[in-house]
From Swiss-Prot:
The lineage of its organism: Eukaryota, Metazoa, Chordata, Craniata, Vertebrata. It is an enzyme of class 3 (hydrolase). Residues 64-309 form the GB1/RHD3-type G domain. It comes from Bos taurus (Bovine). The N-terminal hypervariable region (HVR) regulates ATL1-mediated membrane tethering by organizing ATL1 into a lattice structure on the same membrane. It does not affect GTP hydrolysis or membrane fusion. It has no effect on the GTP hydrolysis and fusion steps. The GB1/RHD3-type G domain mediates GTP-binding and hydrolysis as well as homodimerization. It comes from the Eukaryota. GDP binds at R77, K78, G79, K80, S81, F82, Q148, R217, D218, V276, N279. Residues 418-439 form a coiled coil. It holds the Pfam family GBP. The modification N6-acetyllysine is found at K395. This is Atlastin-1.
Amino acid sequence: MAKNRRDRNSWGGFSEKTYEWSSEEEEPVKKAGPVQVLVVKDDHSFELDETALNRILLSEAVRDKEVVAVSVAGAFRKGKSFLMDFMLRYMYNQESVDWVGDHNEPLTGFSWRGGSERETTGIQIWSEIFLINKPDGKKVAVLLMDTQGTFDSQSTLRDSATVFALSTMISSIQVYNLSQNVQEDDLQHLQLFTEYGRLAMEETFLKPFQSLIFLVRDWSFPYEFSYGSDGGSKFLEKRLKVSGNQHEELQNVRKHIHSCFTKISCFLLPHPGLKVATNPNFDGKLKEIDDEFIKNLKILIPWLLSPESLDIKEINGNKITCRGLVEYFKAYIKIYQGEELPHPKSMLQATAEANNLAAVATAKDTYNKKMEEICGGDKPFLAPNDLQTKHLELKEESVKLFRGVKKMGGEEFSRRYLQQLETEIDELYIQYIKHNDSKNIFHAARTPATLFVVIFITYVIAGVTGFIGLDIIASLCNMIMGLTLITLCTWAYIRYSGEYRELGAVIDQVAAALWDQGSTNEALYKLYSAAATHRHLYHQAFPAPKSESTEQSEKKKM
């Protein structure tokens, strides 16, 4: 349903506006304003307000229009919302030469204020989508998006990375709001956040993101690089230049940024003045802002938002409508709500982890080398008790080595890496036990000896049971004997050829299970006892051939 009415806008003027709703029921007309669509909860989880998102982006007037999403992101308390409100003034009054407004008019729109505490949380979008005609005549929908500042005292690194990455993934124009300069840590944070966003997206041969604009606020060196886009372009070219004399780490940061965005530019903006910075009651009136700032602001905003500057949102080369943007918003937030992505770490945590892992690797390598000297490939078989004693000595030595290395993170942080070291050493010890046992001739002969014993026992039992008329049992024993004989031949072939190793391992496991039913002596004792007890039955079942003289003597007796 659509309604027309004259509303007083945020800057005191009247304008004719059309409000659209997808709902069938009539809703009261609401004044345009910021709407929270991404909420960061107290437990640092994320929630998307789909109802609000649908209400704004799926209205009949805009849902099938190709969308231009403009976002401002960066550190907290650096004037992002303040800048967004000047963007709103331009969007509402862009046909006017003096779009910046009256000098006594307070600045309203997205919530902002002076001070040191954060104002915006999550992601907010302006409830009114602006329909703009591009130079080619195509009408596009322009969405303005304000984001939570990074690195405030209440947000984790994951919170900051998620909000920044999500806004970069959704936007077609991402303004990276910086203060005074582009420092190396700014580039490293950008690398981290964009990589966190790229992880959540499908693999593509195209650059994953579109336009990145470095907006350097409070620029203090106009004598080196002039205010505006020309000075910014020269400044950024110098900052992002990759040269052979740079450290590899610095080169990688710059290459990564270039690989992520199709277009990168920069604008240098002067300081708004001392009154803005120090007046606790500053409400955005132009009369309190320095003229140099206003002059460059009048250049910046049209440079960002004029029809010819607007970049339509594209994903994998396909232009996205407002309807499609809603679906991508939902899909991306599901990824960040889950645990598929690794949690980003602070530089201290990442360094401490690398430091501890290096100590684990060194201690483990020391254990490995000394165990090789004791029971390596060319060393003879070592008694199991002696091997265990050496293992315990070397394990203690490796633990001392780990504890002696200077590590970042403290004792508590290192404790789990110590446990990891002990676990890995115990796993290595198990491998050394198996390797040492393979050198034992009795251990190596365990499988054929076990199979031979099975063959012999079943042969004897088959003979005895066949003699006393238990043909079924005799046949069963003969079958087992035949299968065991085939298994023995198969095992011998596997050991000789090296083929079908998995089958050989199964045969060894079965033989080991039979072996473990009793010691070798017990098995032999039982075997000999059975043979001695039933020897006469065996001879009766399988009589030896008689000589001719014996047969003749028996005939005479008869």
